[in-house]
Structure formats: structure tokens, C-alpha cells
Amino acid sequence: MLTIRPATEKEYRAIVQWNENRGEEYLFQWAGFTSYQYPLTEAQVSAQAKKDGVTLYMAFDRETPIGAGEICDINEEMKTGRICRLIFAEDAKNKGYGEQFLKELSRIAFEELGLVSLSLRVYCFNVNAIRCYEKVGFRVTEFFEEENSHWNNYSMELKK
């Protein structure tokens, strides 16, 4: 059974481990280009998690951390927010955990935080992630063409 809760400092190591030996492009794929530098360190994860408006959540299968993601960029006036920096352990992928995690993050955003809309960005090549987001109800709202077309991406949105 999947459970989620806000991450604690001791769990940041798992996020770093999920990136070990994966390369810079993998880090960019799940975290974007601005939040972290390769190679990822616990200090970087800690600094990101402590930023105003960021809540880092961990997903667990029993007591084992298997995934992480943020609710961030909350606009209280517009009641909007973003889901950012989603990552899962390699052995937790393609088992339905991503869908469960997103559903729970969405529930927290809508029911506990009072948001009415969530958005996220995803690279066009990340077809598995796009399918997962669509299963939860996210829909593509915008396409962003980058100078390097490999990094073209979509904005997706889920409304309450």
C-alpha cells in the first residue's frame, strides 16, 4: 500500500541514490534545468525543500521510500499550484505508484490546500509520464518549443 507524507531530512538520501550513475540528462528530465546541479547532493535537495512555497512529499511502499515530488508555486489568490520534480526509484516504476502518488498529491492540493487547479510540465519524449498524468485527469494545455527540440515540453493541468 502506498502512503505519502512530507519528506524529512533523513529521506533526502533516497532521492540522491535514485540519481546515482544516471547522468546529467536524467536529472534534467525529472527536475528541470534550474533547481539542481549534477551531481545531485543531499544539500541541494534540502535547500530546494526549504524554499518558501515548496512542500516535498515522499511516497512509501510500506516503510521503503519509492518516490518523491513537490507541490509548489502556490498562488493563493488564484488558488493554483504546481506539481514539480517527480521521481521514482527504478524498481518502483511501471507498477501504478505514479498514478497513486499523483492522485494523493492532487487530493492534498484540492482538499487540504483549497486549490482549484494544478499544473505540471513534462518533456514530450516522456511518454510514460504523460500517460500517467492523463490517467489522473491532467490534460495538455500548452506546448513549449525549445531551441533544442529534445527538450520540447507540455504544460498539463488538472482542475478540481
Regions from the PLM with identified roles:
Residues 1-3:
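Extreme N-terminal starter segment of soluble prokaryotic enzymes
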Residues 85, 89-103, 107, 117, ...:
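Conserved glycine-rich acetyl-CoA-binding loop
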Residues 6-12, 17-93, 102, 108, ...:
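Acetyl-CoA-dependent GNAT
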Residues 81, 116-119, 123-130, 135-160:
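C-terminal "cap" of GNAT-fold acetyltransferases
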Residues 12, 57-60, 97, 110, ...:
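Aromatic side chains
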